[in-house]
Design a protein with these regions (language model features):
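Surface-exposed binding/hinge segments that line
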Residues: 8, 22-28, 100, 119, ...
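Gly/Pro-rich hinge or "lid" segments in bacterial periplasmic/extracellular proteins
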Residues: 67-75, 164-229, 235-237, 356, ...
Length: 532
């Protein structure tokens, strides 16, 4: 098995090179890619952040052991290619994953990359090292990791407590770069050092992030760009006008609403625009330990009060999708089909019938037209959060709940919900990896840091482990759908809808592939070039 998989990696690399060779003749070196950003991150440390505005700009600073092919639109297990690894192999019992490593790779400060760096990174992620991450949002991904062992300087093995076929996909995410052993987590927050195609230059909060070409990159003749500059502008109308005026080459993927995309196409017909299935869901989180929301009947009433289709119609011109925890098809590989989704509590289209039940429950709990429940609805201070939060507040009025909007700066948002410093909130959750292990472990298992509302059902945890071990994909999907139903029955985190955002770029920008089932995994940027 080991020999077969390593050979596969080599052959796959040769095939990619052969396919790419003719196109390479037209590619040009040079130029700075100008991109606007919708917000300012708290730090530059991917492993300590949870928002795309922290991950995407510095994905090009790093490399992974393996990565989803940057030119395949839909992430899937067959689209994983080696990066700092040269291949991989599983043991017969599925509990050991071994990577031979690329030699001659240097960190941006000139020090050599070795197996020690891989071990250091996953010791940090698993919480087993002396130094600790200040925040470790994806620690739950590695709860099944027994440890990482080095075999000399250029081979590592991941030892698991039990089989977990999805581990390779987790390692292929943009959230899974290798960090250098010799740079502290503290320093990585302000000046990250990687092995990737671009070197970090500068981060000025609320202003810009700048990257420059890594002249010593291990992949020869890459990257094509001399650098990338991200400018932070929070006003949607302003940034769209600036893009149309030629100030930027590329919009921030997913941030262009359907109406704004129409504006760009009307005013700048030469622009190339795409609207892909959304992999980010808008959801309702309720602090289950904060009275009166510790009452499951009240939480059920709030879930029944939602008119999901209204969100889609108002915010996406009807182009968004209704879905559960797992991204629905056709963009997602694991989500429930519509006919199954509509059988879940609250997910059917009988809105008025559901709201009548919700009002009956609220009256039984002592609320009504003359005694309305007053709450704060917290959300992140960006349009993609604020706009649906306003609709949520309006809908809750139908069931005797009056909400007051509380907006929170991005740098404070995730720490706030992680420590459960809220009562009711509207949140957005992206599909980091389109696989049940990622979303279920990170957001729904007992005690996970991404489980912002404190949901805990030991029976669900057992099911999550069971599906994680299952090698048969169809059997695993059936288990994942069973978990979806239990989460809906528990009102764990009602999913409202999946957005459908757009992206546009100037015609001289080449080499972009926009992925349909993750906003996080397609931004290594080494193959993007400017036809100028």
């Amino acid at each position: 098995m080991t020999r077969h998989l390593r050979s596969y990696a080599v052959v796959a690399g040769l095939l990619i090179a052969l396919v790419a060779a003719p196109a390479a003749l037209a590619q040009k070196q040079g130029g700075i890619l100008r991109v606007y950003m919708i917000d300012s991150p708290a730090s530059m440390s991917i492993h300590e952040e949870s928002t795309v505005v922290a991950e995407r700009p510095v994905m090009g600073v790093f490399n992974n052991l393996v990565l989803f092919d940057q030119h395949v639109k839909q992430n899937n297990p067959d689209a994983i290619v080696p990066e700092l690894a040269t291949g991989w192999s599983w043991s017969e019992d599925g509990t050991e994953l071994t990577f031979p490593l690329r030699q001659g790779v240097k960190w941006h400060d000139g020090k050599p990359f070795t197996a020690k760096d891989v071990k250091c990174t996953w010791d940090l992620l698993a919480g087993r090292s002396e130094e600790k991450f200040r925040i470790n949002p994806r620690k739950a991904w590695y709860r099944n990791l027994e440890g990482v062992a080095t075999n000399g300087d250029y081979e590592v093995s991941f030892h698991l407590k039990r089989p977990q076929p999805a581990l390779l996909e987790l390692l292929a995410s943009g959230w899974s770069p290798v960090y250098p052993c010799h740079v502290s987590p503290r320093d990585m927050r302000s000046h990250p050092i990687g092995t990737g195609p671009f070197k970090f230059v500068e981060f000025k909060p609320n202003e810009h992030i700048r990257l420059t070409r890594n002249e010593d990159y291990w992949r020869k003749d890459r990257p094509y760009l001399d650098g990338v500059e991200y400018t932070m502008l929070k006003n949607r109308s302003t940034v769209i006008l600036a893009f149309i005026a030629g100030k930027y080459d590329l919009t921030f993927a997913g941030s262009v609403t359907i109406p704004l995309m129409h504006d760009i196409q009307n005013q700048m017909p030469e622009a190339i625009c795409q609207s892909n299935p959304g992999s980010v869901n808008t959801n309702l989180i309720i602090n289950r330990s904060a009275p009166p929301f510790d009452n499951p009947d009240l939480r059920r009433a709030m879930a029944l009060g939602l008119d999901r289709k209204a969100f889609v119609d108002i915010l996406t011109e009807g182009q968004g999708n209704l879905g559960g925890v797992l991204q629905p098809p056709p963009g997602g590989l694991w989500g429930l089909p519509t006919e199954v989704l509509q059988t879940l509590p609250g997910y059917g289209l009988e809105v008025e019938k559901n709201r009548a039940k919700a009002r009956q429950t609220m009256q039984r709990l002592g609320y009504g037209p003359e005694n309305r429940l007053k709450i704060k609805v917290s959300t992140r201070d960006t349009p993609s959060y604020r706009d649906p939060a306003v609709i949520l507040i309006d809908q809750l009025k139908q069931i005797y709940i009056d909400g007051e909007l509380e907006t929170v700066d991005t740098t404070r948002w995730y720490p706030k919900v992680m420590r459960k410093d809220y009562t009711v909130a509207l949140n957005l959750t992206g599909s980091t990896v389109d696989d049940p292990d990622q979303g279920l472990y990170e957001n729904y298992t007992c005690g996970a840091i991404g489980n912002y509302n404190g949901y805990c059902n030991p029976e669900v945890d057992k099911l999550v482990d069971r599906q994680s071990m299952e090698a048969d994909r169809e059997k695993r999907k059936a288990l994942a759908w069973e978990i979806e139903r239990k989460l809906a029955e528990d009102d764990a985190r009602p999913i409202i809808y999946y957005n459908r955002g757009g992206i546009c770029w100037r015609p001289e920008v080449k080499g972009i592939t926009v992925m349909v089932n993750s906003i996080y995994n397609g931004w290594r940027m080494e193959d993007i070039w400017l036809d100028k």
